[in-house]
Amino acid sequence: MKTAKKYNPDLILHGNLIRAILSLAIPVVINSFLQTMYNLTDTYWLGKIGTEQLAAINLVTPMQNIITNFGSGITVAGAVLIAQYIGAGEKEEARSMANQIFICAMGFAVVCAALCFLGTPAIVNWLGADGGTAYYARVYLRVVIWDMPFLYMVNIFSAVHQAQGDTVRPMFLNLGGITLNLFLDPFFMIILDMGTAGAALATLLAKAVPATVAFILLCRPENDICLNRRYMQLQREKLGMILKVGLPTAIGGSTMQLGFLLMSKNVFVYGTEAMAAYGIGNKVNGLITLPSNAIGSATATIVGQNMGAKQPERAEQGYRFSMWISVVFLFIGGMILSRDMISTAIVSIFSKDAEVVGMAADFLSVMALWCFTNGVYNTTSGLFQGTGHTEVTMAIDVTRLWVFRFLTLWFCESILHMGVRSVWYSVVISNGISSLILYVLYRCGIWKKTRIKVGKKAA
């Protein structure tokens, strides 16, 4: 394909599977790392300014993620459906689907950003913030929420290229954004002394630039899959497919993020320092699990194309390779990160407050020890996404947080009286249980049942 000249088009469907997994996953790891650096850069500079500013961002970030994850269901559906069309040899349908994804995602982003902007005071009040934390949270959210259309544009670009087996171009696109953000953060926050408003503005501008580039590249007619007026009218059949695959992902992701928001409220009960520690621990732990997330994403592409090509045995083999690579990596990385000396040294980069550092290091040590379960969770989720069974991942996403995590939190707080450590253990226990359930569902063979039919050949 013209948009993926660097890659052997037969690698995913007929080549070495381990090579296919790594060729897809490594650029996604780098890309995800760059995305995480957006938030870590803000965290680093805000940690230099004050604990209230840091706590404010940690408090409102889950709310922003709720909306972002709901819209991401559209682009996840796009990646799955485009990949299956490509596997089935239906390039014209793949082009049409890419344009339908663009219309849906961008429309959703603009409407939600406007509503969230208007509702910012109510959102911050509901979160229970007061004083300086509430003020900084309102300032940050009102600015950063407008990055949604730009973020979705980049996600559309990534979905289109990932479905074709090209994860390198999205990586370079985000590299430009993070490089820009590294300069803009200290400029707005320190030199211009804009604090949280500066952090939000820097992030907004750093996403606007790559989004503009993404739009220009997707409009190039020489690409096999591009944006074109010819396909810009909503098609009921394809809209139905997007909703069938994307809505469960959207509901699961946003419901899960709402749970994270309520978790933040539970942490905030223990004070501003605990809130800051919780945010730091989550972000650092997110770095160690990036390869697992990337391999899960690669699994969805490999499974999607092979299921479209009617090769379920190869799809399953790709999943198994992916899972073991992910689990082994996370087990080794987790063992290293769980050492107190290492975890303390890492979190000290983001805060000089001794109490914050102590709690964040403790949180990180507990999570790192059990992060290998994420390897099972992410790759098995990728399997179900690639086959279009997003209703399974939705159900597990929701129960992981709203059932297992909150029940564990209640038990540790009310029965065992573990204090803030109740939060730490509720995270690892709920992740472990959910990973086990997902694997059992895989063994039951649910993923083999046809959920979506793509292309003219399936009509």
Name each model feature, range by range.
Residues 12-44, 48-49, 62-77, 81, ...:
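N-terminal transmembrane alpha-helices
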Residues 23-42, 143, 154, 177, ...:
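Transmembrane helical elements of multi-pass membrane transporters/channels
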Residues 66-69, 181-185, 211-215, 287-290, ...:
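Hydrophobic transmembrane alpha-helices of multi-pass small-molecule transporters
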